[in-house]
Each structure stands twice: as structure tokens, then as C-alpha cells.
A protein has these predicted regions:
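Short beta-strand/turn micro-motifs composed of small residues
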Residues: 7-9, 37
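Catalytic-site signature of metal-activated, phosphate-bearing donor transferases
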Residues: 69-76, 92-205
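Short aromatic/hydrophobic "clamp" motif used to bind/position activated sugar donors
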Residues: 84
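Cell-envelope/extracellular polymer assembly enzymes that use nucleotide-activated donors
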Residues: 2-4, 32
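Short, well-formed alpha-helical segments that are part of the catalytic scaffolds
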Residues: 12-26
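Conserved donor nucleotide-binding strand/loop of the catalytic core
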Residues: 49-70, 74, 78
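A conserved acidic beta->alpha catalytic loop
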Residues: 22, 29, 33-50, 64, ...
Length: 205
């Protein structure tokens, strides 16, 4: 079984470097990394260039043009694996998730796996929590398990839809991983980054 780890990146150079370091040390040789770059960020290009000097990956540029679904669909179209595991550049998977992703897929003939995500926002205040209607645990996790549709068969029928707050369609069978931090994606960010993203999304809607 071959898994394509698809990454979309804009200007998250340090986050991309962290993610690539994690994947390089954990994924199997037959797997692949697919990187879709939006824009011309020199730091991102430097990180990718450094990675390609010692590793292989499918890398291409594509403008977002306000359409997140089309951007993610382009990753699928450039992937050759049996399954696609989509990860945003500012996220990273737990070691346990990477370790068990293939055994889980091999034991379950399903189209889609929903993955729990640990969101943390450095600098968040009670005012932010009330304003956005978030649930925050004692550990500081926002809206956990915040399930994400990220691991799916590489099939022509399965594609993302909606320009903003995109959702995946075409999967007939699916399952949810248990809400366990050892099987989660991690999504840390600062409050400044959160507010920047909120403003960007509001302009697109």
C-alpha cells in the first residue's frame, strides 16, 4: 500500500520544515510527499529546496485564487498513492497516527477516515472564546476532537467541494478514529495567526 502525504502551503516556512522533518523520519519508502505551493515565498522555497537536496517529493506551484477545494483537489490529481493523507503545512500528525495509519487502512476497506485534531491557540482569551463560540478544555484544546476528513482513497469519485470551509464528497464508507491524542493531528497557532486567518476567510465568503 502506498500513501501520498499531500501538503498545501502558503507562507508557513517553519511549520513546513517541522512537518517535513516528521514525515521523513516516519513514512515508508514506497510512500510519497506531494507539496502544493501557493505564492512565491522565498523562505518556503528555501525549505523545499533544502528538503529536495536530500529527499524526493512531488512539488508544484498553484495559485489559491480563493478556492481551497480546487487547491486540495490539485493535490489529489498529483498523487499516485492508493490513499491520500492531506495535511495543511501548519499541522503535524502524531507519531502514533503515522505508525498506525497503514494497519488501520489495511484492516478496514473504507473510503474515508476522519482524524481527530488537537487545536491550540497561544494567546487566546476568554473574550475570544466567547466571541467565536469555542469549547476549550482544561488542557487548552479548542473544540476537540474537531474531526477532519483527511485520509481517503485516491479515487476519481472523491473530491473536495466549496471554496471556503471545504468538505470532501464521494466517499461512500467511512470511519472515525477514536478521540485519542496519540492518533491525532496537531494544529498549534498564535492568536495573531488565528485572527489573520479569520479575516482572510471572511473576505472570501
Amino acid at each position: 500500500m502506498k500513501v501520498s502525504y499531500g501538503i498545501t502551503v502558503h507562507n508557513e516556512a517553519e511549520e513546513l520544515k517541522r512537518l517535513l522533518n516528521i514525515l521523513t523520519n516516519k513514512i515508508d519508502k514506497e510512500d510519497e510527499i506531494v507539496i502544493c505551493i501557493d505564492g512565491d515565498d522565498e523562505k518556503v522555497e528555501s525549505v523545499v529546496g533544502e528538503y529536495l537536496s536530500e529527499n524526493e517529493a512531488i512539488v508544484y506551484k498553484r495559485k489559491l485564487d480563493g478556492d481551497f477545494a480546487a487547491q486540495k483537489n490539485s493535490v489529489i490529481e498529483n498523487s499516485t498513492g492508493d490513499y491520500v493523507f492531506h495535511i495543511d503545512a501548519d499541522e503535524y500528525p502524531s507519531d502514533g497516527l503515522l505508525e498506525y495509519v497503514k494497519p488501520i487502512l489495511e484492516a478496514n476497506d473504507i473510503d474515508l477516515i476522519w482524524v481527530p485534531r488537537v487545536n491550540t491557540v497561544d494567546g487566546i482569551t476568554e473574550q475570544h472564546i466567547q466571541q467565536w463560540g469555542w469549547r476549550v478544555s482544561d488542557a487548552g484544546w479548542v473544540n476537540y476532537p474537531d474531526y477532519q476528513s483527511r485520509i481517503f482513497k485516491n479515487s476519481p469519485e472523491i473530491r473536495w467541494k466549496s471554496k471556503v470551509h471545504e468538505r470532501i464528497f464521494g466517499a461512500e464508507t467511512f470511519s472515525h478514529l477514536p478521540p485519542n491524542e496519540t492518533l491525532s493531528l496537531y494544529h498549534p497557532k498564535t492568536i495573531d495567526k488565528q485572527e489573520e486567518q479569520n479575516n482572510f476567510y471572511s473576505k472570501l465568503m
